[in-house]
Amino acid sequence: MSVAFTSLGMFSRRTNWDRQPNRLTELLEARRAAGQPVFDLTISNPTELGIDYPERELLAALSNPQALRYRPEPRGLLSAREVICRYYREKELCVDPSNVFLTAGTSESYSLIFKLLCNAGEGVLVPRPSYPLFDYLAQVNDVKLRHYHLRCYDSEWRLDIDRESAEGAKAVVIVNPHNPTGAFLKRPEHQEIVGVAKENGPALIVDEVFLDYPLAQDDRRFGSTAGDAEALTFTLNGLSKLAGLPQMKLGWIVVSGPPPLAAEAMARLEILCDTYLSVNSPVQVALPPLMKTGGRVRSQILQRVKSNYETLRKATLNSPCSVLNVEGGWYAVLRAPQTKSDEEWAIRLLEKAGIYVYPGYFFDFDEHKYLVVSLLPNEQAFASSVQSLVAIVEQNCQTE
């Protein structure tokens, strides 16, 4: 191959990522290559964690002969969209099937909405801390990210959005409950955000993939934004978390808002979806039984998350490493002693005991004192790893 074809100038700037592994990743790869044990407290794939999936029912759902027919519907098959509307009816929300757009997962949902709303270089407001995926999605869609903050007061996270920060943004992204802090959107926060949208004009993109994983009841929570008519709103969800089926690659967008805005958004979004037609027929045909069995899978996952959170909470009592309040989702945030940075603590845990956790900077925390762990691992392995984690932190604090 000639030099011209191997030149970096061949490729777009949007894909010019820093692909060098960080120190933690290098240590993790070296440990695995050497055959040393790794106790992964970041794992979030429920299909590999001993969850009891109803295999016979799931496989039967995927063997429907109707899946052999191809019907290119930009919004997705009506039968599948009606199932999604029933899901919202169970939450006492009225959603019309015409307002539902099927996608090949939440990442594609974001990409479609960014394309719908943003010209190149325009901004979208996202939370900080937040999931690292936003950076990649913004870059490949030529969107600039701006940030509002989640701030922690008395172990509870609260949104801090003001009109000045939202000015000029084409959309505000809300993750409800937030990942990784687990903070649910509260009613006063929702009203504040709607007020910002009405005054400054940004659309609302509300990611609800963890909505059905509350760890406790709280009457302050707003619930789902599906069907909200006060501001142009795109509500996202999908099978990956809702049914514990990430391999099925089915997500959806519910469009709502003032009728003229919502109608224009849906007309344009339909053409975008028609351009890709990315959702496969078998999963659309199988959606009714997948949603039904998904409820049983979700119950198991929620039970495990609650159990592991309680284990973590008890293990960190009277410890220099404390766990912040978790309201929902699959993750927990630990506040580590400031004798080391978050990355230094993560490296220490991996070197000493093979325990792999996320340093908070992976999620763009403002302060480098947080560690993030998944609440999905097997309960016994999780409890053992957490005990070792706490012991290492305590021992380190005593010697420094």
Range-by-range predicted roles:
Residues 2-105, 112, 160, 278, ...:
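N-terminal small-domain helix-loop-helix segment of the aminotransferase-like
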Residues 126, 147, 206, 357-359:
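Hydrophobic residues in well-ordered beta-strands that form the structural core
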Residues 227-306, 314, 392-394:
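Conserved core segment of the aminotransferase class I/II
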Residues 67-199, 211-227, 234, 387-388, ...:
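Conserved core of the PLP fold type I
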Residues 34, 141, 199-200, 319, ...:
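Helix C-cap/helix->beta junction micro-motif
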Residues 288, 303-313, 323-336, 367:
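Conserved glycine-rich beta-strand-loop-beta hairpin in the small C-terminal domain of fold type I
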